[in-house]
From Swiss-Prot:
Its EC number is 6.1.1.21. GO terms for cellular component: cytoplasm. It comes from Lactobacillus johnsonii (strain CNCM I-12250 / La1 / NCC 533). One of its GO terms (biological process) is histidyl-tRNA aminoacylation. The lineage of its organism: Bacteria, Bacillati, Bacillota, Bacilli, Lactobacillales. PROSITE patterns: AA_TRNA_LIGASE_II. This is Histidine--tRNA ligase. The keyword Ligase applies.
Length: 428
C-alpha cells in the first residue's frame, strides 16, 4: 500500500511554511498590541462541547464533525471551530471570577477539522486564527472586535475586502423571527430539501444558510430579521454602525447574512474578498459576531462575549495573490565555508558565535569542495559568506564576502564576536 496523506490534508513544506510563520507572527504581534493573550485548548473535546455550542441541527455538527468513541467509550469530537473549546476552558477554569480582569480577551491559532469536500482554500484539516473577548456587552466591545478584524486584514496586506454586517437581535427578537420563518416555510415544506424540512421544526434560521437549490428559490422572499428587531436591538446596532463610520470603516448592511453556528446573538459579520483570480464571486475569509448566552450553555454565569475567526488556508490564497512579498523565501545571514585541515571545527565555532549574536548561520557538515560550498551558500540565499582557510586561520584572519555585490573584507578572528560592527563597515 502506498503511504500518503489522507484526503483533505496538506503538507506545508519548508519552502512554504515560512510564509505561514510570517502571517502568524504578524497576527500574534497585532493581538498582543491590543492586550489579547494566547490560549491553547485541546484539539479534541467531549462531543457535547460542540453539539451544545454549534447546535445539533447545524451542518458543522450533523454533517461535518469528526466524532468517535475512544477506547474508554467516551464520545469525542475533533475541534471543528475554535470558539467552543475556548468557552469551555473559560468556564472550567473559572475565568469569570472576580480576580480575572474583564474583559478577558484571548487569541488562538489552531488546527481544526471538518469533513468537507476539499477545494481551494478549504481542507478537512485547516487552520483558524481567532479572538474571543468575554465580559462586556458594550457596543464598544463589538466595535473593538470589528476594528481589530478590519485592521488585521489591512496589516496583512489583504485588498478589496468588504465588511458585511447584520443583527440577530436578542432572545425575544429571535423568538418572533423563529415564528415568522416557521409560518413562511411551512406551506412549502414538501418542496424543501430533507435537511431543511428537519430544520424547520428544530431551527428554521438554518434554512437561510442552505446551499441546496430546492431551498434557495424560497430565500429571497423569506422574512428579514431586520423587520423584527426591537427598539433596543436597533439602537444597539445603530450605535455600532455610527462608530464604524467615525472610524472610517466601510460596511454593507446585509439582511441575508446568517452565520453557520447556532450560538450567535446580536451583531454578526463577515469580511468578504472579491478577487476574480481566485473565485467567481466574493468569498468570506473572516467571520464572527456576538454570543451572549454560550457561557451559560456550559453552566457558567451569564457572560456576554464577542469574537471572530479567520480561515488561514483561504487567507493564504488571498495573500499569495495580493501580497506576494510575504511569500518571498527568506535566506540566511551567513554561510561559512572552509577549506584545509583543521578548519572544520572552527566553522562550527564561528557559526555558534554568530547564532549567539542573533544571526542565522549555517556551515557545510558534509565538507564538500569549496566550489560546492559556495553553490550551497547561493542556494540557501545567504547574504554573506565567511571563508575559513588553513593558512588564514593560522594567521588569525578570515574573509567575509557580501554576495549581492561581491564586496569583501578581511577581519581578525576576534572580530567574529562583534559581527554587527563588521557588517556596518561593509555598508560604508
Amino acid at each position: 500500500m502506498k503511504v500518503q496523506r489522507p484526503k483533505g490534508t496538506v503538507d506545508i513544506l519548508p519552502g512554504e511554511s515560512g510564509s505561514w510563520e510570517k502571517v502568524e507572527s504578524i497576527a500574534r504581534n497585532f493581538f498582543k498590541r491590543a492586550n489579547y493573550r494566547e490560549i491553547r485548548t485541546p484539539s479534541f473535546e467531549n462531543y457535547e462541547v460542540f453539539s451544545r455550542s454549534s447546535g445539533e441541527t447545524s451542518d458543522v455538527v450533523s454533517k461535518e464533525m469528526y466524532d468517535f468513541n475512544d477506547k474508554g467509550g467516551r464520545h469525542i469530537a475533533l475541534r471543528p471551530e475554535g470558539t467552543a473549546g475556548v468557552v469551555r476552558a473559560y468556564v472550567e477554569n473559572k475565568l469569570y471570577g472576580p480576580d480575572v480582569v474583564k474583559p478577558f480577551s484571548v487569541y488562538y491559532i489552531d488546527n481544526t477539522f471538518r469533513y468537507e469536500r476539499p477545494q481551494a482554500g478549504r481542507q478537512r484539516e485547516f487552520h483558524q486564527i481567532g479572538v474571543e473577548s468575554f465580559g462586556s456587552d458594550s457596543p464598544l466591545a463589538d466595535v473593538e472586535t470589528l476594528m481589530m478584524a478590519h485592521d488585521l486584514l489591512a496589516e496583512l496586506g489583504v485588498k478589496n475586502y468588504e465588511l458585511h454586517i447584520n443583527s440577530l437581535g436578542n432572545a425575544q427578537v429571535r423568538e418572533a423571527y423563529h415564528d415568522a420563518l416557521v409560518n413562511y416555510f411551512t406551506p412549502v415544506k414538501d418542496q424543501l430539501s430533507e435537511d431543511s424540512q428537519r430544520r424547520l421544526s428544530q431551527n428554521p434560521l438554518r434554512i437561510l444558510d442552505s446551499k441546496d437549490e430546492r431551498d434557495k428559490k424560497f430565500l429571497p422572499n423569506a422574512p428579514k430579521i431586520v423587520d423584527y428587531l426591537d427598539d433596543e436591538s436597533r439602537e444597539n446596532f445603530k450605535t455600532i454602525t455610527d462608530m464604524l463610520e467615525q472610524l472610517g470603516i466601510n460596511y454593507v448592511m446585509d439582511d441575508d447574512l446568517v452565520r453557520g453556528l447556532d450560538y450567535y446573538t446580536g451583531i454578526i459579520f463577515e469580511f468578504m474578498v472579491e478577487d476574480k483570480n481566485l473565485w467567481e464571486s466574493a468569498t468570506t475569509i473572516l467571520g464572527g459576531g456576538r454570543y451572549n448566552h454560550l457561557v451559560e450553555e456550559f453552566d457558567g454565569p451569564e457572560t456576554p462575549a464577542v469574537g471572530f475567526g479567520i480561515g488561514e488556508e483561504r487567507l493564504m490564497l488571498v495573500l499569495k495573490e495580493q501580497n506576494p512579498d510575504l511569500f518571498q523565501e527568506e535566506g540566511i545571514d551567513f554561510f561559512i565555508t572552509n577549506i584545509g585541515a583543521g578548519t572544520e571545527f572552527k566553522a562550527v565555532e564561528v557559526a555558534r558565535s554568530l547564532r549567539e549574536q542573533g544571526f542565522s548561520a549555517q556551515y557545510d557538515v558534509d565538507q564538500k569542495k569549496l566550489k560546492q560550498q559556495f553553490r550551497k551558500a547561493d542556494r540557501v540565499h545567504a547574504t554573506f559568506v565567511i571563508t575559513l582557510g588553513a593558512k588564514e586561520l593560522e594567521n588569525g584572519v578570515l574573509n567575509i564576502k557580501r554576495l549581492s555585490d561581491g564586496k569583501t573584507i578581511d577581519l581578525s578572528l576576534e572580530d567574529i564576536n562583534n559581527m554587527q560592527d563588521v557588517i556596518n563597515k561593509l555598508e560604508d
